[in-house]
């Protein structure tokens, strides 16, 4: 992936920069310089800062050199999203997808897959590895996961020597140490760290008062220190036998966000069943967050996603309540959903139809 003069007017770097239509940040330039030198690179940057643009450039370089690029992600939802993005950029015929559920165009020059799929290909010495030039490891900090981290390590150790790795991570404290380890395993690996967060994070408490409807929202921090109003609430809760305040219902939080113009929102719940229960609670409490036009579009996307499932299958899977929730603008998303349902949720979310 090191053709001559990548920065020349007709070179891959110049063509790529023209195609994106905006000026790159310095950290993106540094990472792309490393790729132009044929080096692997570790990019550590906050969410929303544009680190995936570095991966997109590495993919473009591999294609320009007549090779293949594999884009790995830790979860199927990210694979599906990246598959759609790369297909829109390079053409659907040039992008494949390999997950536990789907095998679509595995011989394409760009293949998006979960990291476990690549590990299994390496174990099997698959011919799909022929001409592989670039591997993107998205969310590479999963390497530190006690349960799945060995998968990322095996991919790094077992991949052919000439493959360039572009490893993407959220901000980590030990990026330089991580980079030194990558260099020991893969050869020269440039570490590029960006600390500026372009999308500011704001943290809040949400509380409700017993016997009353509605939600009060308090900033978690004030002038960089814990909000004293929040600390007072906490102290009252500890002292009081009959607590005045309670955790708000999910529907109350959604109503607050809706009134404040803060939708769409994602609620993270660490249980599949609890995700489904939360969806039912919001819908059963009467929230309808979509317009007539949005509901019609949701219905169309849902019907196209489930068209291969029989009526009996749909009844067994609880299609009626699930699709009604989607039309209301609310949906669960987790690995327990059948692929057709999960695809419908992702398509609706990507179009801004889910709230």
Q: Regions from the language model: what does each represent?
A:
Residues 44-47, 54-81, 160-162:
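Conserved SF1/SF2 helicase motif Ia
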Residues 80, 87-96, 273-353:
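Conserved C-terminal RecA-like helicase domain
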Residues 157, 164-166, 171-281, 331, ...:
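Conserved interdomain linker/interface between the two RecA-like ATPase lobes of SF2 helicase motors
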Residues 33-40, 52-67, 87, 153, ...:
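Walker A/P-loop NTP-binding motif
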Residues 111, 115-117, 123-167:
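SF2 helicase catalytic motif II
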Residues 67-123, 180, 190:
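Conserved nucleic-acid-binding Ia/Ib motif block in the N-terminal RecA-like helicase ATPase lobe
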Residues 37-43, 67-68, 108-109, 163-164, ...:
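Pre-Walker A (Motif I) flank of P-loop NTPase domains
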Residues 1-41, 67, 292-327:
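Helicase-associated low-complexity/disordered flanking segments
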